């Protein structure tokens, strides 16, 4: 009888510790801006290059996925979309978003975006400037076609006051879109390096 009581007590202790640990586990969000339709280097796609990476990250971490979208969609044709995006960048515009996401309940946020002329898309700035990033861990990931990170990691450190910005994943959009196995392995390796 005494042995049963000890086993029951140990079991209850382990269950309690597990429940407390689960309650204390940080909430993670993958917030991504990506553009489908006609894209440079990959043709017309159903999912934008950065969205492809975002889904891999969400799948491998169990994080929730949120897509940052401009209220007014970009044109489907590549050169028309770049004309609009370049005009937004030149004006330092902050386009309205289709919807927003309350990030207050998240401790860790993976932030994905394509590099457009060496910078974040302007809709990403709209999202960033709408929130308090104090105490958040931000993990950037981006796609590009030759410009790499373009200093956007430093831009995020300046913009997201009070947050901790970790090492970015940087990948060519053509790799994300056309070499999914390679992309998935790169994402997994990067996440392991971050402790996920």
Where do the model's predicted regions map?
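N-terminal beta1-alpha1-beta2 submodule of the flavodoxin-like/Rossmannoid cofactor-binding fold
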Residues: 21-108, 118, 185-196
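Extracytoplasmic metal-acquisition and chelation regions
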Residues: 28-29, 151-174
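Hydrophobic/aromatic beta-strand patches that form the interior of the parallel beta-sheet core
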Residues: 31, 66, 110, 139-141, ...
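Solvent-exposed loop/turn segments at secondary-structure junctions
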Residues: 35-38, 70-75, 115-119, 144-149, ...
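Helix-loop-strand module that forms the ligand-binding subsite of alpha/beta enzymes
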Residues: 76-162
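Glycine-rich phosphate/pyrophosphate-binding loop and the adjoining helix
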Residues: 164-196
């Amino acid at each position: 009888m005494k042995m049963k009581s000890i086993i029951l007590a140990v079991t209850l202790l382990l269950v309690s510790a597990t429940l407390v640990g689960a309650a204390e586990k940080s909430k993670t969000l993958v917030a991504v801006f990506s553009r489908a339709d006609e894209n440079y280097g990959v043709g017309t796609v159903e999912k934008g290059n950065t969205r492809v990476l975002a889904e891999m990250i969400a799948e491998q971490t169990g994080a929730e996925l949120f897509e940052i979208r401009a209220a007014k969609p970009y044109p489907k044709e590549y050169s028309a979309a770049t004309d609009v995006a370049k005009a937004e960048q030149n004006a330092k515009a902050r386009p309205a978003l289709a919807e927003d996401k309350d990030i207050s309940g998240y401790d860790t946020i993976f932030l994905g975006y394509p590099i457009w002329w060496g910078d974040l898309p302007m809709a990403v700035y709209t999202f960033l400037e709408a929130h308090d990033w104090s105490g958040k861990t931000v993990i950037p990931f981006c796609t590009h076609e030759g410009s790499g990170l373009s200093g956007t990691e430093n831009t995020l450190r300046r913009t997201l006051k009070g947050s901790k910005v970790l090492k970015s994943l940087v990948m060519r959009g053509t790799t994300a879109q056309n070499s999914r196995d390679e992309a998935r392995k790169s994402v997994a390796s990067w996440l392991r390096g971050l402790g996920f």
